Amino acid sequence: MLEKVGCGAIAIPCNTAHFWSSDIANALTINFISMVAVTRDFIHQHNGTDMDNLRTIVLGMEANIQRKLYGYSAAGWGGAVPDVDSIQQDATRVIDDVKSGNISRARFKMALLVARTRSLKPDAIILGCSELSSASRDIFKGTDVIDPVDVLVDACISWFRNS
């Protein structure tokens, strides 16, 4: 339907929806701007290497971690894997707070979560759930926290300007 009214591209700002991104893209006759693909490209451009060569921590729902949308976040962590797993469980609690409308508590927990995550010195921290994006608006300084929603917005603007 969007195609019939002149939409030139579709983007979905939800990591979980990208489980079906190939099905979605194959069903379209217009461009599908994949949040996962543009985020992986962004990280590659800013780190000079593929994500598989970086120590990353993906924060998100367990399903997103298991599906490895952004690669295997426990790679290269050795004995710190239990800490990474615990951090990801804390991310789920932030997501639950956002979904229940408790944004101020979610923002507080999110700040603590990112500080704890940074203590492990990852190359990148990826917000693998759009609820985490909404809980993190403007509270982070630095380039280590990657918000796929922000990357997707930039990619959509770039697509629009170039089409």
Residue map of PLM features:
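Non-catalytic structural scaffold of enzyme domains
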Residues: 1-163
